[in-house]
């Protein structure tokens, strides 16, 4: 979910070219909903290249994190996805009940992204972009991509979407029974 928010920020900045990005994003994020965000096509290569740079900005991260917390606190139980949800957003009040960390080889991940992009971008470019983004996410100063200690590791290289969901579902069932 946080990835979508950063992608939405990138789309807005690319399309509207504001002079002051932070003021612009604060205003845009005041009254926004998940439904408003998912209406947009946010998985273009142009947005993907822009989002990794934008996500390093501490002020942008603060705006996105505040929106996430508002949305999370509105709900009693919620499923949230993002590269720093367990490590930065839901570390306390509310704290996550369960965290997953997904690992996949660059080759498989790039191929899957390439298919998502309907093969409109050369696979070589998708691979290069994904490698750079993952590197930037892991090395950024603010909220780097890390696996939290108690996260359940799911290696998705050799798993179908159905198999990944089954693993997650089993883990969720165990937590809900306790």
Model feature map: region roles:
Residues 102-105, 155:
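Conserved AAA+ ATPase "SRH/arginine-finger" region at the nucleotide-binding site
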Residues 91-96:
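Phosphate-binding loop of NTP-binding sites
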């Amino acid at each position: 979910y946080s990835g979508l928010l950063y992608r939405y920020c990138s789309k807005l900045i690319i399309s509207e070219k504001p002079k002051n990005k932070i003021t612009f994003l604060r205003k845009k994020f005041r009254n926004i909903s998940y439904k408003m965000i998912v209406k947009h096509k946010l998985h273009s290569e142009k947005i993907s290249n822009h989002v990794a740079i934008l996500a390093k900005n501490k002020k942008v991260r603060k705006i996105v994190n505040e929106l996430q917390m508002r949305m999370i606190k509105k709900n009693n139980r919620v499923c949230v996805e993002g590269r720093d949800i367990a490590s930065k957003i839901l570390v306390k009040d509310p704290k996550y009940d369960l965290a997953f960390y997904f690992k996949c080889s660059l080759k498989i991940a790039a191929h899957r992204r390439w298919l998502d992009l309907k093969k409109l971008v050369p696979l070589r470019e998708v691979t290069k972009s994904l490698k750079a983004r993952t590197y930037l996410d892991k090395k950024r100063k603010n909220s780097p991509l890390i696996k939290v200690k108690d996260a359940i590791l799911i290696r998705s290289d050799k798993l179908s979407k159905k198999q990944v969901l089954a693993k997650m579902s089993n883990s969720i069932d165990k937590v809900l029974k306790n």
